């Protein structure tokens, strides 16, 4: 088995003015508590951020020199922010994590072992543990806040088939080979669809994907997050990703139209209706 090299790994995070400082603090602490910590953590602050959030970031920089930050002058959105981060990474591998999620202590270790043992895999995701943030804020107990395990197809052939209808990897759980992500074009501007677009780009150049069945990240589910991803505003990016799938030869136009109708129906239902 290849020697595990944590110095080859960067964790990539993006935060912005409305990022919760307590959640970011928990996210960073979960990275410092890894059994096998990444060599560096790169935090992209997407535009100006409040003083209290900056204080949290400064505290972690003071106590953890491996944390590097890049401040974007204006808020550009998560796609350009991650693309900027991707351009700055010098390590062979990078792991994505949301600024409000919590990584389990063995996440980095298990993913890097898998990727070093499977040189044909470009990116490896994992199952994620969805947690209700309202319950977590009241109890501070992730087990009590857990709502479900979100698992996706494991093997490459299955991820390709799944990509025809939905995003085949949980983006906040992903570890990937930096060079191949850059080769695919990286993060392009697809509102709320940047991860789906990235997987499609990788498949289009023949890169192989995989999902570990083990849940290694606590993924917060928030009402505001769901509201941003519902309504008619989601139609345009949904259709754009379907057009991309057609152009890459991943799906056909009839299948794409069917996908748009079926997969978008739930997203366009007003949130109050969904809560009934």
What do these predicted regions represent?
Residues 98-102, 127:
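The conserved acidic donor/metal-binding loop of glycosyltransferases
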Residues 94:
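Short aromatic/hydrophobic "clamp" motif used to bind/position activated sugar donors
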Residues 72-89, 110:
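Glycine-rich, basic loop-to-helix element that forms the pyrophosphate-binding segment
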Residues 106-144:
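Conserved donor NDP-sugar-binding/catalytic core segment of glycosyltransferases
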Residues 18-33:
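Short, well-formed alpha-helical segments that are part of the catalytic scaffolds
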Residues 11-14, 151-233:
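Conserved nucleotide-sugar donor-binding catalytic segment
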Residues 6-10, 32-43, 65-68:
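Short loop->beta transition adjacent to catalytic acidic/histidine clusters or analogous donor-positioning motifs
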Residues 45-55, 98:
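A conserved acidic beta->alpha catalytic loop
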């Amino acid at each position: 088995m290849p020697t595990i090299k944590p110095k080859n790994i960067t964790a990539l995070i993006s935060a912005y003015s409305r990022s919760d400082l307590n959640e970011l603090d928990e996210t960073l602490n979960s990275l410092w508590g890894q059994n096998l910590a990444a060599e560096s953590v790169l935090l992209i602050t997407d535009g100006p951020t409040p003083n209290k959030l900056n204080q949290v970031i400064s505290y972690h920089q003071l106590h953890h020199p491996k944390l590097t930050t890049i401040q974007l002058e204006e808020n550009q959105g998560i796609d350009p922010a991650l693309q900027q981060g991707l351009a700055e990474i010098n390590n062979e591998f990078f792991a994505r994590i949301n600024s409000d999620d919590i990584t389990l202590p063995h996440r980095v270790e298990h993913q890097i072992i898998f990727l070093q043992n499977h040189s044909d895999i470009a990116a490896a995701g994992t199952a994620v543990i969805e947690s209700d943030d309202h319950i977590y804020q009241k109890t501070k107990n992730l087990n009590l806040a857990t709502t479900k395990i979100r698992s996706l197809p494991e093997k490459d052939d299955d991820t390709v088939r799944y990509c025809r209808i939905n995003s085949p990897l949980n983006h906040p759980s992903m570890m990937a080979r930096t060079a191949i992500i850059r080769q695919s074009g990286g993060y392009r501007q697809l509102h709320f669809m940047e991860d789906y677009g990235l997987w499609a780009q990788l498949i289009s150049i023949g890169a192989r994907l995989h999902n570990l069945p083990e849940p290694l990240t606590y993924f917060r589910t928030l009402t505001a997050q769901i509201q941003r991803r519902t309504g008619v505003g989601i139609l345009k990016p949904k259709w754009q990703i379907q057009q991309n799938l057609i152009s890459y030869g991943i799906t056909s136009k009839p299948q794409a139209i069917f996908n748009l109708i079926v997969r978008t129906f739930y997203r366009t239902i007003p949130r109050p209706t969904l809560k009934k």
